[in-house]
Regions:
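Long, basic/Gly/Ser/Thr-rich N-terminal segments
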Residues: 1-4, 8
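Phosphate-binding loop of NTP-binding sites
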Residues: 10-14, 22-173, 181-183
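Cytosolic ligand/metal-binding cores
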Residues: 18
Length: 183
């Protein structure tokens, strides 16, 4: 896939479809051009189920530590990687591998983590942020995190987090201030 920077309408030619992130505004010149040309446009949130549906997804969410945790996981698990920061191990935020495994940094900012189909869900913490997406409603925010965890077969949580510690889910509970050897 060719990446063209900066954004320009000339980049939109005859693509089958366009995928855009939550950071892209509706008036983005490429998104506007794609719509003018009748090209289907999908948000990252909408396309995730199709990208991850047949994969064994190792998903990491949380307000802090997602990229670090995801990069560490990516060094341990053979497979594709989609994370938020550049991995020092492979020099990119993405790695493709012919494997069913995908290490995925799950995004709670737009609740797209609910579309990530996790086999394993790790939540480093559930500190309230991006509250505008949740209508400034803590119950909605926490329900999204709980929903993310409920979708996974295996769950790992920070048992010292104020919210996560209250969940009545079967999960590996880590206590980072004292002991992380329970994995």
């Amino acid at each position: 896939i060719e990446v063209i920077t900066p954004h320009c309408k000339e980049a939109i030619k005859d693509q089958d479809f366009v995928v855009y992130s939550a950071a892209i505004k509706e008036d983005n010149i490429e998104l506007v051009e794609a719509r003018i040309k009748g090209i289907k446009c999908f948000s990252r949130k909408e396309i995730l189920p199709y990208v991850l549906e047949d994969k064994c997804v190792f998903a990491v969410a949380g307000a802090h530590g997602k990229s670090t945790t995801s990069a560490m996981l990516a060094s341990l698990i053979e497979g594709s990687v989609i994370i938020g920061a550049i991995s020092k191990q492979f020099g990119s935020n993405m790695r493709y591998a012919k494997s069913d495994n995908v290490v995925f940094e799950a995004d709670e900012s737009d609740s797209s983590f609910l579309n990530s189909n996790p086999y394993l869900a790790i939540v480093t913490n559930a500190e309230p942020e991006h509250m505008e997406h949740y209508d400034y409603d803590l119950a909605k925010f926490y329900a999204a995190y709980k929903g993310f965890l409920e979708r996974a077969k295996v769950r790992v949580i920070n048992a010292e987090d104020e919210f996560l510690s209250t969940l009545k889910l079967d999960a590996i509970r880590l206590y980072p201030s004292t002991d992380i050897t329970e994995l």
